[in-house]
Amino acid sequence: MAQILTPDALATLFTDARTHNGWLDKPVEDALLKQAYHLARMGPTSANCCPARFVFICSSEAKERLKPALSSGNLAKTLQAPVTAIVAYDPVFYDALPKLFPQSDARSWFTSSPELATETAFRNSSLQAAYLIIACRALGLDTGPMSGFNNAQVDEIFLAEKGWKSNLLVNIGYGDINKLYERAPRLAFDEACQVL
């Protein structure tokens, strides 16, 4: 049976964690990104399909290539962030299912239905983006997920060779607490939940 995390750990992952828009001038080591991925990959996905693919934009040259695809509101914070992760998905993720889900012929579920494949890839890569955020927080990093970018441009610039499709971006680094907005409210349990 799983143990309940300490209040401090829960605060790190949830109640004290924030979405950052400003970043300290402090690099993120590649080894830490690898560690975050190794944690995030363990989160559940449908039939262990693991459709997410991650491109970590770290160099100034790569950031310049990303720049034209960003919306104006996301430009400054993304260029300042030490790392921007493109969370993408592989449309033919199901080709890995004989390895990832050997107990069943799960590949055929998706080759017979392109609509199901696309829906599954998008939903589960979104889940995996959330796992990456939690993994980064657990490792002392801050994040800033966002949708304000031109998907087609990102796909053409960074993903075309592999055929992946972008879902969202996540800025990663060490957040500048002086650039935080006041925390916005969240919906109460009774506003967002039902127990039937």
Curated annotation (Swiss-Prot):
Q: Give the transmembrane ranges.
A: none
Listed GO MF terms = 3-hydroxypropionate dehydrogenase (NADP+) activity
- EC numbers listed for it are 1.1.1.298
Per the entry, what this protein does is: May reduce toxic product malonic semialdehyde to 3-hydroxypropionic acid, which is excreted.
Stretches of the chain forming a coiled coil according to its record: none
Question: What's the catalysed reaction?
Answer: 3-hydroxypropanoate + NADP(+) = 3-oxopropanoate + NADPH + H(+)
Superkingdom, natural source: Bacteria
Q: Name one Pfam family in it.
A: Nitroreductase
Is NAD there in the keyword field?
Answer: yes
Kindly provide the name given to this protein in its UniProt entry. Answer: Probable malonic semialdehyde reductase RutE
User: Which prosthetic group or cofactor does it need?
Assistant: FMN
| UniProt KW keywords | Flavoprotein, FMN, NAD, NADP, Oxidoreductase
